């Protein structure tokens, strides 16, 4: 009985940790509200988020003086606030940990502000890896 409970717990924990790792098609569907916004296509977003966070909604990257959060790797120096950077400009008026859940609504709202202020080049992966040959980033299962 104890081994069954252990296996059940491992299964639940494994599933819970996998929940934030999205697939290409899930990202394609989730980001439909960004289609064409700022002149950026959905395949460009799918490519950019893959190279930025690996489709991981809980990705956190610590830099020397800042941290980037979530699927879009939104920075705490300018766009959101956290304990590490209490003097953030917080342009998106949001706590950075909100970018670590599976609800991408607030992430997308902030992404639109980033696009309006600085454009797609905020995401370095876009220009280097996601501005051409985008067929591989399409999802046929819509």
Swiss-Prot record:
Key words of the record: Calcium, Disulfide bond, Glycoprotein, Lactose biosynthesis, Metal-binding, Milk protein, Secreted, Signal
Q: Where in the cell is it found?
A: Secreted
Q: What residue range is the signal peptide?
A: 1-19
> Tissue expression, per UniProt?
Mammary gland specific. Secreted in milk.
> Where does the C-type lysozyme domain lie?
20-142
| Main subcellular location of this protein, as a coarse class | secreted
Tell me which domain of life the UniProt entry assigns to the organism this sequence originates from: Eukaryota
Q: Which Gene3D superfamilies does the record cross-reference, listed alphabetically?
A: 1.10.530.10
Give glycosylation sites per the record.
64, 93
Q: Any S-S bridges, and between which cysteines? A: 25-139, 47-130, 80-96, 92-110
Q: Where does Ca(2+) bind?
A: 98, 101, 103, 106-107
Tell me a GO biological process for this protein: defense response to Gram-positive bacterium
Which InterPro entries does the UniProt entry name for this protein? Glyco_hydro_22, Glyco_hydro_22_CS, Lactalbumin, Lysozyme-like_dom_sf
SMART domains on file: LYZ1
One molecular function GO term is: calcium ion binding
Query: Which Pfam family name is an example for this entry?
Result: Lys
One GO cellular component term of this record is: extracellular region
What family does the entry list? Belongs to the glycosyl hydrolase 22 family.
State the oligomer form and interacting partners.
Lactose synthase (LS) is a heterodimer of a catalytic component, beta1,4-galactosyltransferase (beta4Gal-T1) and a regulatory component, alpha-lactalbumin (LA).
Reported function: Regulatory subunit of lactose synthase, changes the substrate specificity of galactosyltransferase in the mammary gland making glucose a good acceptor substrate for this enzyme. This enables LS to synthesize lactose, the major carbohydrate component of milk. In other tissues, galactosyltransferase transfers galactose onto the N-acetylglucosamine of the oligosaccharide chains in glycoproteins.
Q: Could you tell me what this protein is called?
A: Alpha-lactalbumin
